[in-house]
């Protein structure tokens, strides 16, 4: 793979401290209509403009997710039960969708319909009648809505037989055919188990902005998937299938740009986020690739800013064998993708870190966390004029340093 390696000396020369200041984050937001759903003390809140409002009480609310039009929120409730709920913002009325449906759920990209999956069964409901499933499909390994919202892209469940695991089939399922496997459209069959490829499941599926490609992780058995999974792409017609790289089982760590066929991901095996994690960007059609993480550093989360820039959460790489005990707090860096130039957005600190960068039109948000308290910061797209916008956010779960901040924070920004 041809790559654009940014050496440490060049990085230190290019890094520029961009002062944050203490300005009111509302001044940065300007006229943009920005709403955040967040979790505080296990309860669900929203912030709109400069007003905060509690919407639903816990215990242990997590995973707030907006409907496509910003009129509904879906969320989970309960640390172990994972009840699935929907809430209509205009009435603040919550409704239970399913007492066990909160593990995998997704809003339709075009309607107020919510899909969820339990034990290999996929169902979807209308948000206004959440207790009446509109369709059901069995034997589903994982799924995502089609970009049009008129069906699903799904994988089958692999089964262990005496001669090995059955291959995984990728389907396109028209919404009217849900439940009738004879009408599922086979897009591609993944390779059988071999020394070069082993998968018994998949992650969710993510479509490129041009609609030509689908990215996903092919995952081995649970004990292996924590450390290494195969990042794959398949063309929308199923003709072309490629394995791209190895990475951890973290669906937040691969994302398409909002235009074209550019895919960014955090590469590197091993479950620790503090070692061997590199930001790479690939133009899938041409296979032109670039790497942006300097030697002795790790990248742990990122956000696209158009096709020209990216913001990444970066930290000094921990020493081999030290695990998380010597993990450094991450800071934000803005990368120019064409030439590799990089600039500091937040200053490296031994007191707090900058996590989960989120691009919001002309703004940039992230989580500031010091090991005990978490706040949401808001700045302009270059990271300037930063200020606290939400205080006392619940602390997200971390798996070997892989932080799941979307479980407690979700933005809706109207265009």
Describe the role of every protein-language-model region:
Residues 9-14:
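Hydrophobic membrane-insertion alpha-helices, especially the h-region
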Residues 1-8:
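Bacterial N-terminal signal peptides that target proteins for export
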Residues 15-415:
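Sequence signature of WD/YWTD-type beta-propeller architectures
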């Amino acid at each position: 793979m041809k790559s654009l390696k940014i050496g440490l000396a060049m990085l230190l020369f290019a890094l520029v401290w961009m002062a944050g200041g203490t300005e009111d984050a509302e001044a940065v937001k300007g006229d943009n209509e920005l709403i955040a759903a967040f979790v505080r003390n296990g309860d669900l809140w929203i912030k709109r403009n400069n007003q905060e409002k509690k919407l639903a009480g816990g215990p242990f609310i997590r995973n707030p997710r907006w409907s496509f039009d910003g009129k509904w929120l879906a969320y989970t409730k309960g640390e172990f039960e994972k009840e699935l709920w929907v809430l209509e913002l205009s009435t603040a009325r919550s409704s239970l969708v399913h007492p066990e449906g909160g593990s995998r759920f997704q809003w339709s990209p075009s309607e107020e319909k919510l899909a969820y999956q339990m034990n290999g069964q996929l169902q979807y409901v209308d948000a206004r009648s959440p207790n009446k499933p509109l369709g059901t499909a069995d034997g589903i390994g994982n799924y995502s809505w089609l970009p049009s919202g008129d069906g699903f892209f799904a994988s089958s469940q692999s089964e262990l037989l005496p001669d090995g695991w059955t291959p995984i089939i990728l389907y396109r399922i028209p919404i009217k055919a849900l439940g009738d496997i004879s009408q599922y459209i086979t897009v591609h069959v993944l390779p059988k188990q071999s020394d070069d490829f082993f998968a018994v499941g998949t992650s969710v599926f993510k479509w490129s902005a041009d609609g030509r490609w689908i990215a996903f992780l092919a995952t081995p058995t649970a004990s292996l998937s924590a450390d290494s999974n195969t990042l794959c792409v398949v063309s929308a017609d199923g003709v072309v299938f490629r394995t791209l790289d190895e990475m951890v089982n973290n669906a937040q760590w691969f994302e398409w740009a909002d235009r074209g066929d550019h895919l960014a991901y955090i590469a590197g095996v091993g479950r620790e986020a503090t070692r061997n994690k590199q930001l790479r960007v690939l133009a899938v059609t041409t296979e032109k690739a670039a790497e942006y993480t300097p030697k002795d550093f790790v990248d742990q989360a990122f956000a696209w800013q158009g096709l020209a820039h990216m913001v990444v959460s970066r930290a000094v790489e921990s020493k081999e064998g030290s695990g998380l005990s010597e993990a450094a707090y991450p800071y934000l860096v803005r990368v120019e993708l064409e030439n590799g130039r990089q600039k500091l957005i937040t200053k490296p600190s031994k007191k707090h870190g900058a996590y989960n960068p989120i691009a919001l039109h002309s703004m940039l948000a992230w989580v500031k966390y010091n090991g005990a308290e978490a706040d949401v910061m808001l700045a302009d797209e270059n990271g300037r004029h930063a200020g606290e916008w939400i205080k006392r956010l619940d602390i997200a779960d971390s798996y070997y340093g892989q932080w799941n901040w979307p479980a407690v924070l979700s933005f809706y920004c109207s265009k």
